[in-house]
Amino acid sequence: MSIVQNKKAFHDYFIEEKYEAGIVLEGWEVKAIRAGRAQLKEAYILIRKGELFLIGSHISPLATASTHVNPDPVKTRKLLLHASQIRELIGKVERAGYTLIPLDMHYKSGRIKLEIGLARGKKQYDKRETEKRKEWERDKQRLLRIRRSSD
């Protein structure tokens, strides 16, 4: 079940591969995510010292968050993957034009997981072409519905 999706990612990037990663969270963050107070819109993933980190994601603390914990909504969060997957991703990201971006936050067996994508940036003309293709698919479906209802 999806909690948060990064719809902008599919508009701005070609997604080549998808991976599922665990994410290191504190208790107040888990509660806030369960309440639907998370955003991935401006988030991206950096590689530091052979580890992956989620940067720029926003998790708004609940009003009932503990007073002895100082919540930071945009802190850097570590991602958990197998070492072989991390090495593979590092090798692919070092190629020109590739980056890692968060696509989706979801539950799996009671845990919160992050789906990340190996992505290549779209140029402006690619974005326009994708938009035209989507628009044509919508028009085609609309025409088929009209045709079926008139029969």
From Swiss-Prot:
GO terms for biological process: trans-translation. Pfam families: SmpB. One of its GO terms (molecular function) is RNA binding. PROSITE patterns: SSRP. Its main location: cytoplasm. Belongs to the SmpB family. Required for rescue of stalled ribosomes mediated by trans-translation. Binds to transfer-messenger RNA (tmRNA), required for stable association of tmRNA with ribosomes. tmRNA and SmpB together mimic tRNA shape, replacing the anticodon stem-loop with SmpB. tmRNA is encoded by the ssrA gene; the 2 termini fold to resemble tRNA(Ala) and it encodes a 'tag peptide', a short internal open reading frame. During trans-translation Ala-aminoacylated tmRNA acts like a tRNA, entering the A-site of stalled ribosomes, displacing the stalled mRNA. This is SsrA-binding protein. It comes from Nitrosomonas europaea (strain ATCC 19718 / CIP 103999 / KCTC 2705 / NBRC 14298). The gene is smpB.
